[in-house]
């Protein structure tokens, strides 16, 4: 049986440079990522952390690939007890310009069969990337109620 993989594709009216900034600048990520600030120097081999609004680090991993403004890849896993037996998975962002649009493809892979983390990111990524698209195109992120994501406790 093959390991699960999550792929999400969207088209955003922006430039590759603005989208790259939106994916890598912690001040910007907290505007569309449920208040989370991504923290890294974005060099291959460097640490990656997701810092919540209360200052706690909820997710951590390593930067794997950096090719601005075309490709970004990092591993990460959620640090909560719920996911303590899970391995870090690889998230890869590919940015392809098409005129006034950028095609953003996110592939998140490396999950074990039955992964609870895979189940969680499958609900989270569509909301995060929809809010990112809205913010870049309209200047306002979406206000998606956490309950709409239907995460299990």
Describe the residue ranges of each PLM region.
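Intrinsic-disorder/low-complexity, polar/charged segments enriched in Ser/Thr/Lys/Arg/Asp/Glu/Gln
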Residues: 3-9, 47, 58, 71, ...
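Hydrophobic pocket/interface hotspot
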Residues: 19-20, 29, 48, 63, ...
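Short beta-edge strand/loop motif at the mouth of beta-sheet-based domains
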Residues: 7-8, 14, 27-60, 150-153
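Beta-strand/loop substructures that line and gate deep hydrophobic ligand-binding cavities in soluble
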Residues: 80-126, 134, 145
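Short beta-strand segments that buttress and anchor functional surface loops
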Residues: 47-53, 74-79, 108
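Hydrophobic/aromatic beta-strand elements that line small-molecule binding cavities or substrate pockets
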Residues: 10, 60-65, 89-96
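Short, highly charged C-terminal tails/helix-capping segments
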Residues: 134-153
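A short, structured loop/turn motif at beta-sheet edges
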Residues: 16-17, 64-70, 94-103
